[in-house]
Amino acid sequence: AAPKQTAITAPQDIADYIFAHGTLPDNFLTKSEARQLGWDSSQNYVSDVAPGYSIGGDKFGNYEGLLPDASGRKWYEADANYTAGPRGAERILYSSDGLVYYTSDHYQTFTEMHPSGK
């Protein structure tokens, strides 16, 4: 059997994976995928139905305009530093054209991420 993949949860590790592959690591599920496994945010935790997985890949509206906008750019979000229990306030936001940002305070402030070592 293949060795169990280590879940990628740290903000810089998630960002580096996105920079390298253009997508989230395999340990992320969209909200819809998690719901299909039995997740209900009012009744249980993601870790109850999908241990080792985090929520990520859903569209982020950027309605407040706090992230850079460009024609055709789409934004997506992913939980950061999630291991179990309730989802925290940390998120990674990544764009369809290669930008990555981190928020530690649930979309109040954002820090642009860069590949490790750059």
Model-assigned labels for residue ranges:
Residues R35-K118:
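Functional cores of ribonucleases/endoribonucleases
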Residues G22-S41:
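Short, solvent-exposed linear motifs at loop/edge-of-secondary-structure regions
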